Amino acid sequence: MMTHQFEKYLQLGEKTYFNRLGKVVKIVGLTIESVGPDAKLNDLCRIVIDREKDHAVMAEVVGFRDKRLLLMPFENVEGIGVGCIVENTGHPLGVLVGDGVLGHTLDGIVRPTDGGVIEGGCEYPVEADPPDPMSRKIISEVLPLGVKAVDGLITVGKGQRIGIFAGSGVGKSTLLGMFARNTKADINVIALIGERGREVREFIERDLGEEGMKRSVVVVATSDKPALIRNKAAKTATAIAEYFRDQGKDVLLMMDSLTRFSMAQREIGLASGEPPVTRGYPPSVYSEMPKLLERAGTSDKGSITGLYTVLVDGDDFNEPITDTARSILDGHIVLSRKLGHKNHYPAIDILQSISRVMSAIATSEHKELAGRLKNVLATYNEAEDLINIGAYKSGSNREIDYAVQKINAVNQFLCQRTDEKFLFDEEIDLLKKLFED
C-alpha cells in the first residue's frame, strides 16, 4: 500500500533524472548533435568519455535542430564518439570571481594558467544583461591614461567605451600596455582574445610589466583554442570587470581584440546553421557585439571604461566589424601605418580619432588648446606635399607659416616612449606651453 502511494513520486524522480541524460548521435566539425537531454539554450552539459576515469568534456547548448541538441565543446573533440552520454548540469556557465583573481592570468573560464590558486569569491554569470540605461551615471569625470596624445586630444571619461582601430603590426598591444601601466583606474582587466601564444607572455612581461600586473587580471584565450573558449573569454573578462564595478571600483577593461571575438562568434554561428550575411558573418555577430559592449560603462556603483582593439582587415575602415564597432562605441583612436613608418609612436592619427564625451568632461581651456593643435595638424597636412617639394613660399599664407613653425613641437608632444609616464596636469601644462607665444 505504501509503495503504491509513493510510486508516482518515484516515477517522477526517474523521469526527471533520465531527462537530464542524452546521447551523442553525430559529430560534424565543431558541432556535436545529441538526442536529449532536456535543455535550454546556453545550458552547460558534460559529455562523458570514460565514466570509470571520470573523464568528461564540458560543452554548451548553442542551438537545436530537428529535436536534437547542438552542442559545442570547451575543449577539443578528441575522444568523443557516437553513444557518449550527455549530462545536463541545468545551469549556464558561471565564473568564480573575487579579489583573489588580481595578479593572475586566467583562461576563458577562470582557471589559473600561471600555476596560482584562487581562493574565495562569488559566482557571476558569463552571459549577463547590461545595466538599465536609467540607472547609469552620466559620464562626468576624466580617466587619465598617462599617454599625452590621448589625454590631451582624445580625452577619455570614466565609463566611456572607445575603440583602438588599426591594421596588424601598428602598435595596438604596446599602446594597451602603456594604458595599463599608467592609468589612474583602480583595477585593470585585460582580455587577450585569439592572440598568438608567443605574444601573451611578451605582453604580460614587456608591455604590462610588474607594476601593471599588481592591479590587473589577464584573461587569455589564444588562437588555437576552440571558438567557444575565445568567445567566452571576452564575456568572462567583462563579468570580472562587472564584479569590481559592483564593489564601487573604477575598472579599465582592455580587450585585444574585438575582431577575434567576432570571428569566434562567426565560427559558432555558422556551425550552428546560421546563414552567412555580410562577408561571411552570420546575424548573431551583429547582435552579440552590442550586447558585449553595452555591459561596460557606468552603473549606480562604479564604472567600467572599455578599450577595445579592432583589427582593421586590409586597412579597410569600412569593413563590417570595424563599421559596426565604430557605430556602437563612444569614440575611436585610429592608429596610422604611415605614422608608424615615420617612427612616430604611438602612431595615433589625431585628425581621424575622436572622443564623443570629451566636450562634456574637458575644461574650456583644454578644449581650446586641443582645437588649436588639431588646426595646426590639419593645415600642415594639407600643405605638406607643396612644402616637401619646395613649391610653397614662406609668407604666402599666415596659417601655413604658423603650422610650419609649430609642427615639430606638435609632433614632439604627440610622441611618447613606452617607459614615459605623465600626470594629467603635466600633460595639460605641456599643451599650454606649445601655444604660449
What kind of feature is each model-predicted range?
Residues K26-V28, G36, I49-R51, G63, ...:
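Flexible glycine-/small-residue-rich
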Residues T16, K53, E141-K148, G171, ...:
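Short secondary-structure boundary/capping elements
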Residues D54-H55, L93-V97, P112-V117, M134-S140, ...:
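Active-site phosphate-binding and catalytic loops of NTP-dependent enzymes
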Residues M1-H104, I109-T113:
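N-terminal accessory targeting/assembly segments
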Residues G152-L153, G159-D437:
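P-loop NTPase catalytic core
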